[in-house]
UniProtKB/Swiss-Prot annotation:
This is Transcription factor SAC51. Residues 260-309 form the bHLH domain. It comes from the Eukaryota. Coiled coil: none annotated. Transcription factor. Involved in stem elongation, probably by regulating a subset of genes involved in this process. The lineage of its organism: Eukaryota, Viridiplantae, Streptophyta, Embryophyta, Tracheophyta. The gene is SAC51. GO terms for biological process: regulation of DNA-templated transcription; unidimensional cell growth.
Length: 348
């Protein structure tokens, strides 16, 4: 016959056959009735309050007259009632160590089974603060873990953004790389795999040297732009010096030179604007009737004035050439006769 169904509620799912020992079966002493056993157990609990007495001592202190008697269900019930009605201090029973007892009635015999290790059953009042403290500690641990997780998420997102920007800068020429890959695949078909390894090594080296090369290219571009700006300023100053600064009467040429000497801290845009203004003023002084006009009208008038000067020069050159080559013989004779007359008057 199996044991009672309440054996399923044993702590940690232990089997009664593994964790209980048969006290009555091992003992040589005779059995005692259940009511007397319960009374003895209650008296011992009242005396000690913390630890229950070992059942071996209880079994040794029984009467020999009860040997040979069998326990019935009524005796067991009366023993349980006596054990529950005994007055014991509540705090001591709640916090005391308890051992588990099982009465096995299999067949015609009854056996008393005892757990070899004590079982602690803490009181409800003593268990609550422990649970609350444990819960508070668990909550704090969860909060700290959540904060660390959020911080790690922020750092990971920032690192992810930084890596995306770096990848966008480094691998902006993916199309060119794809073309190279297709060409390499076409070349490597039907050959040994060593060209592919060479391509991979080259690509790794390019990935490593990519930022350095790009930085060098940017530095070169900046240097070229600086040199071009310097060349442009020098050429503009040379043109101004060759065309306008030769005229010593213009006082504005002196101001331009002083500005170029002392205005090193000005920006390129401001210097360009100043140069344009000075050139417009010079054109106003050179072109007749161009004062007070706008910049576009002044430029148109200056262009027309230059065209007129060019035509006048061409016409004067043509007249001079025609006058020297087409002299009449009458004028030559007159000059000769006039010269002879002057000679005769001088002799007289």
């Amino acid at each position: 016959m199996p044991l009672d169904k309440r054996q399923r509620d044993l702590p940690l799912g232990l089997s009664p056959q593994a964790c209980f020992k048969d006290i009555v079966g091992r003992s040589v002493l005779p059995r005692i009735p259940l009511p007397e056993l319960g009374k003895l157990y209650a008296a011992k609990l009242q005396a000690r309050c913390l630890q229950p007495p070992p059942f071996q001592s209880l079994l040794c202190s029984h009467d020999k007259e009860s040997y040979g008697k069998r326990f019935s269900r009524s005796d067991m019930r009366s023993w349980c009632a006596a054990a529950t009605t005994t007055t014991t201090p509540l705090g001591a029973l709640e916090s005391s160590q308890k051992r588990l007892l099982i009465f096995d009635q299999s067949g015609d015999q009854t056996r008393l089974l005892q757990c070899p290790f004590p079982l602690r059953f803490p009181s409800h009042a003593a268990a609550e603060p422990v649970k609350l403290s444990e819960l508070q500690g668990i909550e704090k641990a969860f909060k700290e873990d959540g904060e660390e997780f959020h911080k790690s998420d922020g750092t990971e997102s920032e690192m992810h953004e930084d890596t995306e920007e770096i990848n966008a800068l480094l691998y902006s020429d993916d199309d060119y790389d794809d073309d190279c890959e297709s060409d390499d695949e076409v070349m490597s078909t039907g050959h040994s795999p060593y060209p592919n390894e060479g391509v991979c090594n080259k690509r790794e080296l390019e990935e490593i040297d990519g930022p350095c090369k790009r930085q060098k290219l940017l530095d070169k571009v900046n240097n070229i732009s600086d040199l071009s700006s310097l060349v442009g300023t020098e050429s503009s100053t040379q043109l101004n010096g060759s065309s306008f600064l030769k005229d010593k009467k213009l006082p504005e040429s002196k101001t331009i030179s002083t500005k170029e000497d002392t205005g090193s801290g000005l920006s390129n845009e401001q210097s360009k604007k100043d140069k344009i203004r000075t050139a417009l003023k010079i054109l106003e002084s050179v072109v007749p009737g161009a004062k007070g006009n706008e910049a576009l009208l002044l430029l148109d008038e200056a262009i027309d004035y230059l065209k007129l000067l060019k035509r006048d020069l061409i016409s004067t050159e043509v007249k001079n050439q025609s006058s020297t080559t087409h002299k009449s013989p009458i004028l030559l004779l007159k000059e000769t006769t006039w010269g002879t007359r002057n000679l005769q008057t001088d002799k007289a």
